[in-house]
Amino acid sequence: MPGYDDGRVACTDDEIVIRHYYLAGAKRIKYQAIREVRSVPLGTMGKLRIHGSGDLVHWFNFDPRRPRKDTALVIYLDGRIRPVITPDDPARVAAELADHGVRVTAGRESGLW
């Protein structure tokens, strides 16, 4: 698979780049640092979260198109904060992550309803 880039989320050869994660920049996460990525349905509260966190656990990058999306990918790292992304093609990002050895599961996530 040749990679992925929708302008907000990009999968490179060795990391995922989450643009507009911080007010003035991107967050780069090496694939080896990811414990798991969970694909979850995005409820009303998640759809309305354009940027930031409502529970101090899930952190959403800036995505003004999020209200029209139905699926989020929650990235589990070693720390308490879980980055949450809503790529334009979540299935393709999940496949790209799996191709790089990241465990990808599906389920539910409290705090995103």
Spans of model-derived segments:
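A membrane-cytosol interface segment of integral membrane proteins
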Residues: 67-103
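Bulky hydrophobic/aromatic packing residues
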Residues: 15, 86, 109-111
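Non-transmembrane, membrane-adjacent beta-strand/coil modules in membrane-associated proteins
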Residues: 2-7, 20-29, 33-80, 110-113
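Short, well-ordered beta-strand segments enriched in hydrophobic/aromatic residues
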Residues: 14-20
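Short, charged, intrinsically disordered terminal tails
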Residues: 99-113
